[in-house]
């Protein structure tokens, strides 16, 4: 405890510091400490004063120089060997929120090795860090506390027999408007009182793939680029001149102009009907609540008079926080910054991931534009007044603290029993090791696929393929078995190269499809990982949605949304008792599948090539809306300076691009070729290869294309469609199909061009049906029809005849 003289000296030093700092000359209760150094240093317009007269303890240092950058702060350290001398006391003139920034780097000298230090840090009766084990690299920890006393105590408490240390320290009084008194609890109508909690900064992220350094922020906050956390790809936007703080009623204390003047925008222009999100994934510690702040500033377009509404939803872990409508917020003022605060309660699993998302609002007639400028995530102290994972209270009510405060008497009483247990444990361990080795040899035989795809073990010995993955969708095997009645064979709805697909029902009555990989699966572990990762990267109305996966005990199970009508293949020629598809339905299915593939090809900076497009991988929901499935063979496309990806040939016989088959050169046009084969199946109503037919008809492509070139379209049309579709429409359809099936990829259309042609054909078909309706019932009015068309572009007719389906869609958050 320092005496009154030292206390007054400390106050005097800090008053001098305030006069030396141009940024905060008018702000009281702001302190910068250069710990363990006899001199002051200046970094980013802040003067860090020596703590030689402020605390006891000894110092450790390297070369002490004032280079002006942050590395200067890590050249010395203040070291404490006992609790009595390990406290910094800061006089507080005005109560309120304070930011504490602590710098750590374990220095090594001839007399002291700080890498072995073990200590805890507390402030105002909050545990900030417990049993800290220093990293070998520099670390900056940031905390926010509501100080209601006349002094702020910051203690660095060494473990018995060890030491504690600190390299530099900042204590800043925050503007009153920065932290609210309370914030909304997501998913409830309640608020959480923030003033009774301490906070630790987890992430502070700026959009637009740009970081913001400390010297660009009035409070010297570091804003990381969003590129490291983004699960989807958006378009970066920058417009610093558009930011108008006065219009937003806030100051740049909330966030600097570099945050509000940059944004990441959801790519919705290429496909306005995209049911996609922009999602950022952060690793967090389970067992804590998290305070989240979303920053917004419309620097893109004036919402008034704009043909597209700027209206979108924001989510945290799939739970909706709020709908943002730029025409309502701040009266739609262009360039006016604002923010939205919310609190996410304890993570519902031990995975420890937090997903922040923005997504399109699908219940509006105009195409939405969605964006975000930045966000901040802070961990809130728990009921133990702690911010350390050691004290976490997990969702099931248990504690992460595995230690016990067992009394010495109890330990003595158990010592004899432990000796007996030790002997027994040795025998059991020997038996378990033999059993595990035998099982590992078996698994290596089944999954011998190289170092990149080795099955890992968790602490309980379970095999976990994604043990270090950021994907937070893992389902326990017991839940999967419950949903499928222990993989009852009567629930099998499909069989493929990967394994069997079961229909399942989760506890909340959600129907799901459960794809279980067989041990002898031809696709195997690599394809399983690829499919799970692909399904978590993308969310689109016409791509099947991932619900979860299971890799427990070396299982390879994928759980995705159940598609009531099965596959397109089922409705073309594997009919059984299924109804036949009309020409209109077939066109709608082609359009939907093309949209999904178009999104794969254009929805990110590098295209995703599906590589296994076929009628069996196009699923249909209860309204016959198409969704592309099975991403196990998907491959990232070529870089911008490359034309193709060289890779081993994989796919399904009959659908393979001949250029890819002969040269092993994969491009997006390989998917176009495969889709052309699907288009032939759609119009002909027969499989690609049918050995039961005469030799000249076995191969669908060869047989159909010969007849198309001869103009004998009536010979290839599905008999069910004869007389129900105009030959000129079939002719146009076959012309597009023929281009897709060109031997040379360069002669094939891009998926976007193909989609446009299909949309146009659907438009023509719909107009024909309207005309027929009027002819049959002249008294009927078609003014109220939900089908609207325009030839202005693909986006303008993207909702053709599917408005009812789209209206029923429930938008889900990704990852």
Curated annotation (Swiss-Prot):
State which residue ranges cross the membrane.
408-428
Positions of the catalytic residues: 612
Q: Where is the signal peptide?
A: 1-26
Reply yes or no: does the keyword Lyase apply: no
Localisation: Cell membrane
Q: Protein kinase domain: which residues? A: 487-761
Which regions of this chain are Extracellular-facing, per the record's topological domains? 27-407
Binding annotation for ATP: 493-501, 515
Q: Give the keywords, sorted.
A: ATP-binding, Cell membrane, Glycoprotein, Kinase, Membrane, Nucleotide-binding, Serine/threonine-protein kinase, Signal, Transferase, Transmembrane, Transmembrane helix
Provide the glycosylation site positions.
40, 45, 125, 146, 209, 244, 277, 331, 355, 401, 405
Per UniProt, what is one GO molecular function of this protein?
protein serine/threonine kinase activity
Gene Ontology CC entries for this record: Golgi apparatus; plasma membrane; secretory vesicle
Q: Membrane side Cytoplasmic: which residues?
A: 429-815
**CDD domains reported in the protein's UniProt record:** STKc_IRAK
Cite the EC number: 2.7.11.-
Subcellular location, principal: membrane
Q: How does it sit in the membrane?
A: Single-pass type I membrane protein
Q: Give the family from UniProt.
A: Belongs to the protein kinase superfamily. Ser/Thr protein kinase family.
**Name this protein carries in UniProt:** Probable receptor-like protein kinase At2g39360
Protein source organism: Arabidopsis thaliana
